[in-house]
Amino acid sequence: MAKKNKKDKEAKKARAELKNQKNQKKQEKKFQKNKNKSLNGEEDDESDQDLDEILSSFSKKQIELEHVDITSVEKPSCRTHPLMFANPQHNKHELFIFGGEFTDPETKLTHFYNDLYSYSIKNNSWKKYVSQNAPLPRSSAAVAVHPSGIALLHGGEFSSPKQSKFYHYSDTWLFDCVERKFTKLEFGGRDSSPSARSGHRIIAWKNYFILFGGFRDLGNGQTSYLNDLWCFDISTYKWTKLETNSKPDARSGHCFIPTDNSAILMGGYCKIIAKNNKNLMKGKILNDAWKLNLTPDPKKWQWEKLKNFKNQPSPRVGYSFNLWKQNKSVAFGGVYDLQETEESLESVFYNDLYMFHLELNKWSKLRIKPQRQTNSKNSPATSKRKSNKDQEKELQDLLNSILAKSNLNDDDDDNDDNSTTGPNSIDDDEDNEDDSDLDNQEDITISNQLPHPRFNAATCVVGDSLFIYSGVWELGEKDYPINSFYSIDLNKLDGVKVYWEDLSAIEEAKRLGDRDSDEDEFEYEDDEEDEDDGEEEQDAGPLEGDEDEESESDDDKQAQMEIPDERSWLPHPKPFETLRAFYLREGANFLTWSISNNRNLKGKQLKTKSFELCEDRWWERRDQVTLEEERLEDTGGIIERDTTTKPSKRR
């Protein structure tokens, strides 16, 4: 045993010596490289400029603009960490992208943006806005939109071209979604508004914008994570800092979503001192959940810690989280750091899609359904879609007759038979889409696969569609921006619309592999031995391969079980049945149930309640229906697919 220990020590000593030699060679190589730069006059480049000078130059150029410059463009330039948000105006079908950053892979210089883009979903067209009153260039800012048509922007970060110097903003801006105009808000003292930061989150609730968390750079490589809570009153245009008895730990990159009378906070990221090395700050991915109980008086707001939710995704950070409907949110992507040392970081990236039901406190994993094979305008599916109006009229006649028997018709129901509450709102735009709109979609392809794994994607929900723009993927120490744009119909889940996608750099990196990993082989070995000597490891999520094996075994187990039905008296969706088809089939039953439970309502209000109940039921049984769909696909069973919805184009 003693001989073995002695041999291990000698081997370890030899590896350490080899490591020192390699590090010395690296330092010599770096010194020679810097020396050559100095001799060639390259030492005084843009990266050494003072940040105040850079920002001052931007400001001067911006002031010279005499008017707003509006240009039609094919698409935004490639960038990461921008803001993307929907126009909150009803039926506007438009989204905005602001700011972001891009690091040139050849020069390694980083450029920050302050241009604004608008995207018309109906016309599939982009416009670029450049004006003198726009915020200075930045990335990783926070934004939220209010139903009144305004958006609130706060903070963000900026750096020198080689990212040797960083700057965090503390300014607050209002954006008018109608006029496409930014307005900077001024406040009194230093503590009258949130401090400079990035990585924070803002939500809108009633007449307030609510801000929590984030981080700021303190210089000398030090970072401060925040857990302060602020509210912005849109009636007074003032920030107020709120103090609570208990509150979540400081963090950035968290999820923050409003509900009717609360706000839900989940996850996030911070850095802590490593237990075995006080000089090393290790990243910590948080997996807790909190509820902020909201009242009309902000001074009475209080935090409440929540238990873990059912079917919760594995721990991760950098995943998007967007409010979809009043009681549902959707999450995409993210990253989990498996192992972090002073010189390396191993991570797993995700591209899964989840729905979180705010009332049930339950997660559901969403899956893309296989594409139908037809796209002809004269196909049976298209003919079936044309008869869909007849089905809707039959349903309306039936609903009105049920209301008439109970003497619950509105006075104007007879004149409004064609106004269907519910399913029309889902697909009317598609059924009424003219040929010119179809022509604008010619360059869009449909994929049966979710977008490539990534973190920090810019996302927003417009209507029932989730839009995904940009994102970051890593290999070794290199970041790869993903220049791409997608949308997913969250009701149908019948494919991913790919507007554009460039994965060439990522595919090349995967083909070549991480060259740095071969060079650092001995560092990894030493790090592993250090962990064996007693380092407490960070909780690790499953490796990608292990995760697949676990998910497969979990799926096998789920296939053998039934998910309990707490409201078995309500109709059950069929496999592969859309929400629209479910309502057309069972709308009368849902209306009857709504009448018995809403005695004070009439006519249209009862129709609205019946559709809301149908929608809740469709999502409530989504996990069970997904199991049934998977069983049918695995066994090759005959599937009754819904053909009332519009077939997707394949080009």
Curated annotation (Swiss-Prot):
Superkingdom: Eukaryota
Modified residues (Phosphoserine): S47
Keyword line: Kelch repeat, Phosphoprotein, Repeat
Cellular component annotations (GO), alphabetically ordered: cytoplasm
Gene3D superfamilies given in the database record: Kelch-type beta propeller
Mapped Kelch repeat ranges: 94-148, 150-199, 208-259, 262-310, 334-383
Biased composition (Acidic residues): 41-50, 426-440, 516-555
UniProt-annotated stretches for the region Disordered: 1-50, 369-392, 406-440, 511-572
Keyword presence, Repressor: no
Biased composition regions of type Basic and acidic residues, renumbered to the chain: 7-31, 556-572
A Pfam short name: Kelch_2
Bias kind Polar residues: ranges: 371-382
The UniProt record lists the keyword Phosphoprotein: yes
Additional remark text: Present with 4010 molecules/cell in log phase SD medium.
Name of the featured protein: Kelch repeat-containing protein 3
Organism field: Saccharomyces cerevisiae (strain ATCC 204508 / S288c) (Baker's yeast)
